[in-house]
Amino acid sequence: MAISKKIYLSQSAFCSFIDRVHPKHYYSQAFFRYFGQEEYALFTDTITLNQVYNYIYKEISPSLARDFLKTIVLSNINIIYPDQSDIKAALKTLIGYQSSELTFSDAIMAVLANRRGISQIATFDYLHPLFGLSAFFLPI
């Protein structure tokens, strides 16, 4: 079975890549280098972009947060816009999930990835076992 060349980028993947003092910075650099070399299609959503923007604005600098948005506009990263059915599905997932640690942003990310046929998430956070999604790992 062929491995899909689609990756969904989470907040932790972006933040660790941008923040040079982040403990996972070198790992995220390797992720993005690999994605470029192997010509992966990269996806993220508007909620994740807002979270990353707020992180950069508060933790690093407002001007870098603005530059981040400019870079996203010029990049090949596909931005997924959740519609009403995506939000309702995420809310149902959130309400029906057995763990109270699932956040709305994680639920919407899982729903959007599942509906777009994206099976791997680039993340350094715990990935809840939803819809058969898996965390991306660099091949050895």
Spans of model-derived segments:
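A generic structural signal for short hydrophobic patches within well-formed alpha-helices
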Residues: 14, 49, 128-129
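Acidic, PIN/NYN-like endoribonuclease modules and their adjacent C-terminal/linker elements
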Residues: 1-6, 110-111, 115-140
